[in-house]
Amino acid sequence: FVDRNRIPRSNNGPKIPIISNP
């Protein structure tokens, strides 16, 4: 899935979590 608080790369790929909302 794709979080608006994360930079989508791949479903099984690396993701960069951006903590903005709980």
From Swiss-Prot:
Keyword Secreted: yes
Inducing stimuli: By bacterial infection.
Keyword Transmembrane: no
Coiled coil: none
Disulfide bonds: none
Domain of life from the UniProt record: Eukaryota
Broad class of the protein's primary localization: secreted
GO annotation, cellular component aspect: extracellular region
Region (Disordered): 1-22
Subcellular location: Secreted
GO biological processes: defense response to bacterium; innate immune response
Keyword list, A-Z: Antibiotic, Antimicrobial, Immunity, Innate immunity, Secreted
Protein function: Antibacterial peptide active against Gram-positive bacterium M.luteus and Gram-negative bacterium E.coli.
Protein name from the UniProt record: Proline-rich peptide
Organism: Calliphora vicina (Blue blowfly)
